[in-house]
Amino acid sequence: MARVIRWQLAKRRLGNHSVKTRSEIKMTTAKMYKQKGTGKARHGSGSVSQFRGGGMAHGPVLHSHSHNLNKKVRKLGLKSALSDKFKLGKLIILDSSKCDGKTSTLKKKLDDMGVGKTLVISGSEVETNFVKAANNIKNLDLLSYKGINVYDIVKKENLIIIDDALKFVEERLS
């Protein structure tokens, strides 16, 4: 699971921090002033790092932090995350996502189940009333079966899978 989480977080990183080096600065490369006779130190181009407006030496460059991870390892990580939640008794399967659209009723249902930070995985057809009710509840995340991932499962205390999403999850793991 740790490898899969590290892979997910590395893929998520942007890595778009960048500065201009002396070759990227738009400035003349001609000598600033003559070598001798001025009383000043000798200098060449004005684009070097010690001058204002010059390029930075050894600064951050644009690069990707992502790395490869085999599909079998990713699938194994997802299996172990789901089985871990099941062993701890933190996996709940709901038969439907029927809801009247009121946040208070859904919150009361969740409190009756005794769940705190929760991830809800829905099937292909998510009821709009359920989404409306779930959007306003703190510590409740709603994911489609397509977006199921190890990091979100591990991050939340409880996992609720709606019955129509269960077959898609089983299909993905087989």
Could you describe each region identified by the protein language model?
Residues H17, E24, Q50, K85-F86:
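A generic structural signal for short, solvent-exposed coil/turn residues
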Residues S23-K31, S47, D100, K132, ...:
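Charge-rich, low-complexity amphipathic helices
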Residues I25-G59:
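Glycine/serine-rich anion-binding loops at beta->alpha junctions
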Residues M1-L14, P60-S174:
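Extended polybasic, low-complexity segments that bind anionic RNA or targeting/receptor surfaces
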Residues N16-K20, K40, S47, I93, ...:
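Residue-level detector of alpha-helical recognition elements and their boundaries
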Residues M1-K36:
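A short, flexible low-complexity segment enriched in Lys/Arg and Gly/Pro that occurs
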